[in-house]
């Protein structure tokens, strides 16, 4: 279990940590010289019941409040320290205000320096601290009087921490390792003979020696060489634990890891310049949180300047809640639920705090009612509830983006997707969730759009898949439209012939003259096999003009009987299916699962120029895709069946 201290300067936070652990958390020479905590300090203790507790000791001086924020934003349990001889002071109030704004789950009050005052004074300060905690929503929090110098009360506080640690361990065991690994870096340094070390409190997932990770938002790839926790080597570290990670990697000049960066699984690398937050304005704010205000955003262990845009109004009054978009001066690492604190541009006053709702925030339309409704739908911490609300609002949800923003692991996404409330469609790499009602409605819209297309072009068999999808591309993601089209085909509401689609009642026909001429052209195309005759060669064979042959072939093409592959050459669907199968066989036989134009030419026996025309046509139809000098296969001959 990890706890942080909080409280005013010189109220005995570091001495309390030393009394509980035997460790002086002040590590900097200046701290020891001045007797003043400047930066974060760390200490560990093993309690009598075997529970291991880590302490993050934060500075109390207002000048060092950014360092305090770096210590508490990823921690759920805090000791609020107040000196008996001084009572609550300004930084007591501001620290508690911050803890309230970021919704720290548990605060324990500790009254220090009780040996310096009369018992009546101790009781009075206990009452004052209890009132402050109650006003902040922590009315059930215990308050312990202690003296770090004499040891009075330390044992009682330690017993309380034992119970708290046991409860925390039970909750961690019940929750399991949630999500992929993420850790905000609060220290980065180099040790002789060891190399680069970064430290932090694990926010999600787990890390092990040998893992390949990324430093975000910079994007440098690293490998975990070693791990330390509780001052000893360890093999793994999980959410809620502090650890030091020895990493190996290559960094650009000036791009070495620093406080504010994240060490995380590469799949969770999401540099963001614009964030949508849910923010509560501080109860102690002297003025509302106004739209357009320049701010400091504290997130994870980072401190970055940005500008606030209040989305549901022009300002948020003290103690009130609203959505705020922050445009940042530089990228940060952020996902849903990350805690954030806003301070004024001079970094002297806390304006508000809350959590990230959407790290993929759009600038355009950010204040529209539909966008605000989406933000409301994103709010629930439970992924299943949030997904249900998003589907109710949008009816289609990109599951890959949802998993990224929510930091859901593969197993968690699978469990989420295995529900009757919606359908999972799309490819494994780009899954989409859609309600059955929305899929049915999209199908109806596609049928209507296809009917209108037939009316506009009655002599044409039907459009290609790309054209059909394009008819409603603005209405839904391609995966949803593709699934709706597949459902229509399975039910017989639409018919596919080759690469073209039509309604079953639509039966385009050639006029009698064209049908008669087609009967003479077809045997010539069949006889040509993989190299059908050119238009002028067909015209010469039939003693007709090339224009007449071209015109009839184009009308036949509209019916799906042929496809124009080159300027002067038409192919039958069956022949195209053979060519697509050749491409697939070549790719399957290749270790790289790809083939070149030369390989296709040698296998098919057609000339170089015609090979290029054929392959470019297969690319256009979605059967193949060119990557450099080679091609991969996306579909075989069934595309033209």
What are the residue ranges of the model-derived segments?
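Conserved G1/Walker A P-loop phosphate-binding module
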Residues: 1-58
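Residue-level marker of beta-strand positions
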Residues: 52, 77, 207, 212, ...
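Conserved nucleotide-binding/hydrolysis micro-motifs of P-loop NTPases
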Residues: 61-62, 85-89, 104, 113-118, ...
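C-terminal effector modules of nucleic-acid-centric enzymes and ribosome-associated factors
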Residues: 5, 117-121, 128-131, 143, ...
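Conserved catalytic network of the ASCE P-loop NTPase/AAA+ motor domain
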Residues: 9, 36-38, 44-49, 70-74, ...
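Residue-level signature of catalytic and energy-coupling elements of molecular machines
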Residues: 10, 16, 35, 55-57, ...
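Conserved Switch II/interswitch segment of TRAFAC-class P-loop GTPases
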Residues: 52, 58-63, 72-124, 538
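Conserved catalytic-core segments of large NTP-driven translation/proteostasis enzymes
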Residues: 114, 131-285
């Amino acid at each position: 279990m990890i706890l942080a201290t909080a409280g005013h300067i010189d109220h005995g936070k570091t001495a309390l940590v030393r009394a509980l652990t035997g460790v002086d958390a002040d590590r900097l020479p200046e701290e020891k010289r001045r007797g003043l905590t400047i930066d974060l300090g760390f200490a560990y203790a093993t309690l009598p019941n075997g529970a291991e507790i880590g302490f993050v000791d934060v500075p109390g001086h207002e000048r060092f409040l950014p360092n305090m924020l770096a210590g508490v934003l990823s921690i759920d349990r805090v000791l609020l320290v107040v000196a008996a001889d001084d009572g609550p002071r300004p930084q007591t109030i501001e620290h508690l205000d911050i803890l309230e704004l970021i919704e720290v789950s548990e605060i324990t009050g500790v009254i220090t320096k009780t040996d310096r005052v009369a018992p009546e004074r101790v009781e009075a300060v206990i009452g004052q601290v209890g009132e402050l905690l109650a006003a902040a929503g922590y009315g059930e929090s215990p308050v312990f009087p202690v003296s770090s110098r004499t040891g009075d009360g330390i044992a009682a506080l330690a017993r309380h921490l034992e119970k708290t640690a046991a409860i925390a361990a039970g909750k961690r065991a019940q929750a399991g390792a949630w999500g992929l690994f993420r850790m905000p870096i609060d220290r980065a340094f180099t040790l002789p003979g060891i190399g680069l070390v970064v430290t932090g409190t694990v926010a999600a997932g787990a890390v092990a020696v040998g893992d390949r990770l990324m430093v975000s938002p910079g994007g440098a790839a690293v490998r975990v060489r070693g791990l330390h926790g509780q001052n000893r080597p360890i093999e793994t570290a999980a959410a809620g634990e502090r650890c030091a990670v020895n990493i190996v990697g290559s960094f650009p000049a000036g791009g070495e890891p620093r406080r504010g960066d994240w060490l995380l699984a590469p799949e969770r690398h999401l540099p963001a310049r614009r964030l949508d937050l849910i923010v509560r304005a501080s109860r102690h704010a002297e003025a509302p949180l106004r739209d357009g205000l320049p701010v400091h955003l504290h997130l994870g262990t980072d401190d970055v300047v940005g500008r606030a845009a209040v989305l549901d109004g022009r300002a948020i009054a003290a103690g009130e809640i609203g959505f705020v978009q922050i445009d940042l001066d530089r990228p940060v690492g952020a996902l849903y639920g990350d805690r954030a604190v806003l301070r004024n541009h001079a970094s002297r006053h806390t304006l508000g705090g809350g959590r990230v709702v959407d790290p993929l925030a759009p600038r355009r339309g950010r204040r529209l009612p539909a966008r605000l409704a989406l933000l409301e739908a994103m709010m629930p911490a439970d992924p299943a509830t949030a997904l249900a609300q998003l589907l109710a609002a949008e009816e289609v949800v990109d599951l890959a983006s949802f998993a990224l923003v929510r930091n859901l692991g593969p197993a968690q996404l699978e469990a989420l997707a295995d529900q009757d409330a919606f359908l999972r469609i799309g490819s494994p790499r780009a899954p989409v969730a859609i309600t059955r009602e929305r899929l049915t409605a999209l199908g109806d819209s596609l049928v209507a759009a296809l009917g209108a297309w037939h009316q506009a072009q009655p002599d044409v068999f039907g459009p290609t898949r790309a054209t059909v999808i394009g008819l409603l591309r603005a209405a839904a993601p391609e995966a949803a439209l593709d699934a709706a089209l597949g459902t229509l085909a399975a039910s017989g509401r639409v018919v596919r012939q080759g690469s073209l689609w039509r309604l079953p009642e639509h039966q385009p026909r050639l006029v009698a003259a064209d049908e008669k001429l087609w009967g003479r052209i077809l045997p010539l195309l069949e006889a040509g096999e993989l190299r059908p005759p050119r238009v002028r060669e067909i015209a010469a064979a039939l003693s007709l003009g090339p224009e007449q042959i071209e015109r009839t072939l184009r009308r036949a093409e509209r019916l799906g009987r042929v496809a124009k592959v080159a300027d002067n050459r038409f192919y039958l669907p069956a022949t195209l299916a053979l060519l697509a199968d050749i491409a697939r066989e070549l790719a399957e036989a290749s270790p790289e699962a790809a083939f070149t134009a030369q390989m296709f030419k040698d296998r098919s026996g057609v000339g170089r120029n015609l090979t290029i025309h054929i392959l470019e046509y297969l690319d256009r139809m979605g059967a193949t895709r060119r990557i450099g000098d080679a091609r991969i296969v996306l579909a075989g001959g069934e595309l033209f069946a």
